Amino acid sequence: MSAAALELGVTHGAVSRQVRALEAQLGLPLLDRGARAVAPTPEGARLAAELAQSFERMQAAVARVRPGPLTLSSSATVMMRWLLPRLDRFKRAHPSIELRLTVSYGEVDFIRDEIGLAIRNSMVRAPPTALAETLIREEIGPVCHPDYASRVIADGPDALAARARILGTATRPEAWAEWARTIGRPDLGIAPDEVFGHFYLVIQAAACGLGFALAPRLLVEDEIAAGHLVAPLGFVPGPHDMQLWTAAHLRHRPDLRLVAEWLRREMAGTR
């Protein structure tokens, strides 16, 4: 009751009166009102679930016909290191398209959050309301600053594990173990010496000479080309893909289709 009142901007009592009025109209109880808690009756739970689906369909119908910006969601790392550096080309080519960017992680509620497209790693399962497609197979490899590489001389996995300072991220704690398995060295026993809270921080730490980070080529290729990072051991196909999720109810919007095609071309250019 309190949560509903807060969302609707009314009092607790107003919500309670509306529920009682609905119960009187239907001729059956919708809530079990205990001394300490309120819970829906089976009929109330069933009605709530079906009404929620109906409200979602109404929101989706409105979104299909309402003009407005197209929202693209991605992680902060993908947005900072891949999307934003390429966005100017898109805006110059398509100045009439209003594209709004939002940072989010994990699952997406396309209808509630009014999101049209989302870039996600395949570690996250796409929701039923999304059309998911693979944009690119992730390639991963250890990267560091050129000066650090010349000091450490990690010319192989064993040298890397023995000599280098290993940087990890809390968002992908198994990354180094996955890389070791991918190169056929599950016995390597490589583990981070320092863990950062975000992926973009561990890449920046590597660029500042603090050690080796394990990164997808997609997110570091610009800095490698600029000479700010090197990948002494190269890159290998990783266990995950980069995916594009499309809101099913918006899939026919012309601006969405154009942005999606641009993302496909840009990702293909990074192979």
Regions found by a protein language model. Give the residues of each.
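Residues within helix-turn-helix
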Residues: 1-6, 13, 20
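Residues within the DNA-recognition helix of helix-turn-helix
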Residues: 11, 18, 86
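A short LG(V/I)-centered, amphipathic sequence patch enriched
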Residues: 23-40
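Alpha-helical linker/hinge and terminal dimerization helices associated
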Residues: 25, 47-66
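Central regulatory/effector-binding core of bacterial HTH transcription factors
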Residues: 69-127
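Acidic, Gly/Pro-rich loop/turn segments at junctions of secondary structure
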Residues: 102-167, 171-174, 178-195
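Hydrophobic hinge/microswitch elements
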Residues: 187-231, 237
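A late-sequence structural motif
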Residues: 235-271
